[in-house]
Amino acid sequence: MSHKSDLIATNIQKYLQQHQQKELLRFITCGSVDDGKSTLIGRLLHDSKLIFEDQLASIVADSKKVGTQGDRLDLALLVDGLQSEREQGITIDVAYRYFSTDKRKFIIADTPGHEQYTRNMATGASNCDLAIILIDARKGLQTQTRRHSFICSLLGIKHVIVAVNKMDTVGYSQQIYKSIQDEYLKLAGSLQIPDIRFVPISALDGDNVVSKSTKMPWFRGSPLMHYLETIKIDYAHTDEFRFPVQLVCRPNSEFRGFQGTVVSGSAKIGDTIRVMPSGKITTIKSILSFDGELNEAEAGQSITITTYDEIDISRGDMIVHKDAISHVSSMLRANIVWMSEQPLIEYKDYYIKFLTKQVIGSVNKFNYKTDINTLKEVACGTLELNEIATVELNLSEPVCFDSYQKNRTTGAFIIIDRLTNVTAGAGMVIKPLAANDKKDSTNDYSEFELELNALIRKHFPHWDAKNLRE
């Protein structure tokens, strides 16, 4: 991790202690192709003195070979690491960079601007707290600008910095900047992004990136780095306790523990817990980790929980606090971002994976898809690559989840093609649907027939057996 600090040279122990206590901000750079995302990240690192000498020497040499800025230093090469990216002068994969300043630690996700790589962008944005959306001052808002903004809103990113880049190419015009700002605010009226900041920059020349530019005296705001260091992110772990069971650990007849990672909230020894979906209640007897026994476990920790009661707990179950239960349903409404070249169609079976739980499921209704240009709802019967829709899902068995708006981890799932095992889509739960709607459709079949039907569809998908639960 790159970092500039005087403490490194004088007191390494104090530096490490201080570094460990810093807030971590995960952010993403997104926008249309050639808006300057990779160059901006390179400029942030360069002007913050966070590039090692050997890295700088390598970039100087590579700029002469494959650079796109003539005789100037091509800072985009710091993050465009794939050979195909350098040859084409574009970003294809999601590139992650880690650095810190005296105020914060940062993880940057640099994502592709090309439409065909929108799925990579959605992947990069899924864990971020903030998004920098770049707009080329010469081109204004593009289709990908709208698509990426909508995906950021969909994924629950609350803070967006709109960086109007390449201001040097339009003579640092305040009028052009204001026009783009007004157009984006009009778009933002249809999005759920509560905090939007604007800053005019030139990533190539460094204007308003780390230091305030003298070339735009009309801009009264702060440079980009100041916003990154000071924007208040809600880090409070106030989410309800959620512990998806990944593995049942039974090394001998005397021990039975349940292993996994705490995805939200916290729990301590003696807490009364409920196992979902069964609803059975027990008490935490001990919490074990790699470092030994813990009194309390928090989000992000990998632990083993033991209980006082011998109750049935399996992989895919969710352990929660007694009175903070999650939804349990086999029918739900969700937003889908489709990532496969093969379209999503109604009633086709896929694997639906919620954390440690995988079931078979299908779309039994397309509510609508979203037109990226207008953000209006459009009727549809299928979903193509990079399209976004709201659908109703039918699952082979009940699963535990929260709404994505409430919990970004337990409210998310992926859709897997059963024949190729390719991740075909990503989903965000809106809400569960009424359970009695499900029961009405299965009254004509016994439980054995339903289970046999599920087994046939799981192991012989090429038979195209009808889902009896629909």
Swiss-Prot record:
It comes from the Bacteria. Gene3D superfamilies: P-loop containing nucleotide triphosphate hydrolases, Translation factors. CDD domains: CysN_ATPS (cd04166), CysN_NodQ_II (cd03695), CysN_NoDQ_III (cd04095). Residues 110-113 are annotated as: G3. GO terms for biological process: hydrogen sulfide biosynthetic process; sulfate assimilation. InterPro entries: CysN_GTP-bd (IPR041757), CysN_II (IPR044138), CysN_NoDQ_III (IPR044139), EFTu-like_2 (IPR004161), G_TR_CS (IPR031157), GTP-eEF1A_C (IPR054696), P-loop_NTPase (IPR027417), Small_GTP-bd (IPR005225). This is Sulfate adenylyltransferase subunit 1. It comes from Francisella tularensis subsp. novicida (strain U112). The gene is cysN.
